Amino acid sequence: MPKHATSLPLSLPAPPSGTPLYRWFYNELRTAILDGRIAPGARLPATRDLAHEYKLARATVVASFEQLKSEGYVEGKVGAGTFVTQVLPDDLLQVGRSSAGKSVGHRRVQWSSYARRLRLYPGVGPRTTRAFRANQAALDVFPTTLWAQVVARRLRRASAQLLSGGEALGYRPLRQAVAAYLNTSRGVKCSSEQVLIISGVQEALERAAHLLLDPGDPVWMEDPGYPGADIVFRAVGATVHPVPVDDEGLDLEWGRHHWTNATLLYVTPAHQFPLGVTMSLRRRLALLEWARRSRTLIFEDDYDSEYRYQGRPIPALQGLDRAGVVIYAGTFNEVLFPALRLAYLVVPPGMVDRFAAAQAVSMRHAPLLDQAALCDFITEGHFARHIRRMRELYSERLAVFLEASRSRLGGLLEIPEVEAGLQTVGWLAPGINAQHAAVEAAKHEVEVIPLSRYSARRVARQGLLLGFAAVDARELRRGAEQLARALETCPTR
């Protein structure tokens, strides 16, 4: 592979081990756009030409272009080609441009090591909801009128104290309601004094990483696993060690055999992301005992725990913890709506003061009126009723998804049994490349994600992540038909 291209001003290092080629090539293109080597409005070479020049599969280059398009860095013009957008989405990464057009951008800024690590990763933005978008609730049926009434009533009754500010830990009545809810629904053992109200699990991860990790500290993560956690840990300089997942969850024995003990372990035991495995009780107890003996802290992301369609739920790791090694996080954003930006973090008693201090320094507290409205929504019973209704709706949509997939995608995509959550993994027929499949699916207005995007190691089997909760039955059936057409166009090796 040439180090210096002739058609684009790129200097390409060897791709990092475990990084998908399309992601590596996308990062190099994005960096060149951001630092001005590829100017706004510039026309990019054809994907076929770039693939030939850099000795890449054309599907790899196409996938890189699709990622850049989805994030607003480039745009396609029919009959003309692909061009860099005039206004880039990363305004914060560019200090600005002078009136004469000379760049005074971020190349002159002495970024910290944290910032340099952080900017390796792409941003995220709003996307159109369509089949089979993962990680999104059914926003089309959220009770907006009821929510508006609760918010309006709370605003009318707002006291001067509520309007002036509050505790860094969060609105005390909401913390009490969250503690009671978690004790009843998830077996979490905590007082309201251990609960922090935050904006989301991503913030919880960043808070924990800054407080608990020094550069070089080892962190274990499920593989495949949640990339948002990987981003946070690497940004603070931690060394991330991927640990494979088997039928019982994170493979503890594999991790002990291949890695030294960890400072922190991140895990999604209720519904492993993205494979959907529920960690067995036996594995949970073994994990807790190992953490106690090795003095490792566990960050439990109770992802998708609210929606289970088969079997009895297993209590959260935190509820089984007798040694105070578990930090527990969950969110209302996926249960209610993403723009709510309210979640919760439960920390061992000895950690409360440090976490509260960090909260006060960084954001003081989450919006108090929103916290108070959510508290009313919970204590008046609306939240519990909403979860019951949504569990029934998602079960119905899951049935439609499975029926449509099996009738139209048989021989192309194998859908395993789904026990919980809002999405599942579909295993592609032998010879079909997941990245190529995702590109073809996008052309057919279907959103699927290659499983390799979540894995640091080479995946043993090609798979796609598919959501079934965000759209109605008609769109699910349309999606199955369109995905089948897309997969039928994919070459097999």
Segments and roles (model prediction):
Residues A137, P269-F273, E334, V471:
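Short glycine-rich anion-binding loops that position phosphate/pyrophosphate groups of nucleotides
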Residues Y344, A372-E380:
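Helix-loop "lid/cap" segments that line or gate small-molecule binding pockets
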Residues L320-R354, L369:
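Active-site PLP attachment segment
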Residues Q136-L139, D246, Q272-P274, D304-Y307, ...:
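Short histidine/acidic/glycine/proline-rich micro-motifs that form metal-
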Residues M1-R153, G350, A356, A360-P367, ...:
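N-terminal basic, amphipathic alpha-helical segments
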Residues V151-R295, E306-Y307, R312-A323, Y394, ...:
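Conserved core of the PLP fold type I
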